[in-house]
């Protein structure tokens, strides 16, 4: 059996455990039946949400016809994420990672081991790129993807934005640097952060979209947990202003608790996950100073098909999140 055949590798890919992904899976889930296309291009539908209501009508009138809201469709070519792992003869002849010092493994056995471990590593790297793509889309209402070549100085930046014009309507800029809450004469005065978050929630709900949770960078989470008013209100048994209940959602995202923002009790999630950037240093998925007001399932993760020539001389098309090549 050729372990590098597409059929063998497809079966192996399905068995590889997926890297933990928070932003991609929570906010851009993929439906296997609807979101994986059999072509290299995908169709993305966009529809503005409204808060229209039904009218009150006299019984003898019957009903008043309403109008359907339109939508727009864009044909997109998904980003091409491709990475490979070379395997050399000396790696097969020498002891591998985690292998017994007195191992009698043959090069053929080591080759199969490398195939499985390499697929797991490559799958994790691809998942991190998808996670970064999801975060950038949330923060910028679009993203710019640098498509590289085998030369560092030759590349092409390909961008996409999900709004018209030059100003991103989903971006909120505070009028001033955040300040902590203050206590005087037996009364707390909320810091500027409180009104800013309430304004973000209001803007989102006014546009017809739900606001269910708040995701912040690590430094913002530390700032909030150091605020005296938050700590005082969380400890106030006379009113349910909030609660501290640290919960780990993934390895890199955890919930520090919930807080009442003018009647809306919102969970506060902190993201401290990082990836290795092009420079080789760790980069946070969510940059310092970032606050995101959002709800799960705000979008969809669409995938196009991958067509490639196999050893039989014919082209084969793969419909899968990750396609071996």
Predicted regions and their residues:
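Extended, solvent-exposed, turn-rich assembly/linker loops in the middle of proteins
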Residues: 152-244, 255
């Amino acid at each position: 059996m050729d372990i590098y055949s597409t059929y063998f590798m497809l079966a192996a890919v399905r068995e590889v455990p997926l890297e933990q992904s928070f932003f991609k899976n929570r906010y851009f889930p993929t439906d296997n039946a609807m979101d994986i296309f059999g072509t290299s291009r995908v169709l993305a539908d966009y529809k503005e949400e409204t808060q229209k209501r039904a009218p009150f009508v006299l019984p003898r009138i019957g009903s008043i016809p309403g109008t359907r809201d339109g939508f727009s469709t864009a044909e997109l070519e998904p980003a091409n994420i491709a990475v490979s792992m070379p395997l050399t003869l000396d790696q097969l002849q020498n002891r591998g990672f985690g292998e017994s010092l007195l191992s009698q493994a043959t090069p053929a056995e080591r080759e199969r081991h490398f195939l499985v471990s390499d697929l797991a590593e490559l799958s994790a790297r691809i998942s991190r790129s998808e996670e970064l793509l999801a975060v950038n889309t949330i923060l910028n209402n679009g993203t710019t993807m640098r498509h590289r070549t085998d030369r560092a100085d030759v590349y092409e930046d390909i961008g996409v934005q999900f709004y018209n014009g030059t100003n991103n309507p989903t971006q909120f800029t505070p009028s001033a640097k955040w300040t902590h809450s203050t206590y005087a004469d037996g009364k707390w005065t909320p810091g500027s952060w409180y009104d800013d978050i309430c304004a973000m929630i209001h803007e989102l709900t006014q546009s017809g979209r739900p606001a269910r949770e708040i995701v912040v960078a690590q430094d913002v989470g530390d700032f909030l947990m150091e605020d005296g008013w938050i700590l005082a209100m969380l400890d106030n048994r006379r009113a349910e202003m909030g609660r501290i209940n640290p919960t780990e959602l993934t390895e890199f995202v955890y919930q520090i608790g919930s807080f009442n923002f003018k009647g809306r009790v919102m969970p506060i999630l902190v993201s401290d996950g990082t990836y290795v950037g092009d420079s080789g240093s760790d980069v946070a998925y969510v940059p310092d100073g970032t606050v995101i007001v959002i709800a799960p399932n705000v979008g969809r993760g669409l995938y196009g098909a991958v067509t490639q020539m196999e050893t039989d001389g014919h082209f084969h098309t793969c419909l899968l999140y990750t396609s071996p090549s």
